Design a protein with these regions (language model features):
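Conserved ABC ATPase "signature" region
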Residues: 4, 19-37
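Hydrophobic anchor residue at the start of the ABC signature
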Residues: 55, 83
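Conserved ABC ATPase signature
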Residues: 41-45, 49
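ABC ATPase nucleotide-binding domains
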Residues: 141-158
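H-loop/switch region of ABC-family ATPase nucleotide-binding domains
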Residues: 102-103
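Conserved catalytic motifs of ABC-family nucleotide-binding domains
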Residues: 62
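Catalytic Walker B motif of ABC-type/P-loop ATPase nucleotide-binding domains
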Residues: 66-69
Length: 158
């Protein structure tokens, strides 16, 4: 049912799903590899699994751009990695633009084709390797307890 909600903007006034709607839902389930979850209630699955179900709902909507707000929040590292690898795979396989906000900059550097970085005085968009070379991450946080190591592409706690 959650995934079918992605098709709601396309249903008739009764909310009935068409054959095309059902096909889009089935495609989203297949792309996200969640067939084993389709008969479970949302309170029977983990937070990581729920995030993937919600991504399937977004895929079922079949838009060219998918915007996700902090999709890895409250997930452990394993589920974060699984989710980000899925997003990367979906972007490449479906040719959709997937834009997500995150505070997990280290993971975004590893997993993103491009990043948009907001600082206090500018907004910069580029590939992660170019952003590292530009030094943008060095000025991101004004604290003596954190530094960005460009050699390894990660923040280090001092």
């Amino acid at each position: 049912e959650i995934i079918a909600l992605g098709r709601q903007p396309y249903t008739n006034w009764l909310g009935s799903l068409s054959k095309e709607d059902t096909t889009k839902i089935d495609e989203a389930i297949a792309l996200t590899e969640i067939n084993h979850l389709i008969y479970k209630k949302h309170d029977e699955i983990s937070d990581g699994q729920l995030q993937i179900v919600l991504i399937a709902r977004a895929l079922a909507q079949d838009t060219s751009i998918i915007v996700l707000d902090e999709p890895t929040t409250h997930l452990d590292l394993v589920h974060k990695a699984t989710l980000l690898k899925l997003l990367q795979k979906l972007a490449h396989e479906t040719q959709k633009t997937i834009l997500y906000s995150t505070h997990d900059i280290d993971l975004a550097i590893q997993m993103s084709d491009e990043m948009i970085v907001f600082t206090s005085n500018k907004i910069v968009q580029d590939q992660p390797c170019n952003l590292i070379q530009s030094g943008i991450f060095n000025s991101l946080f004004e604290t003596e307890h954190l530094t960005f190591d460009a050699n390894i592409g990660k923040f280090i706690i001092k």
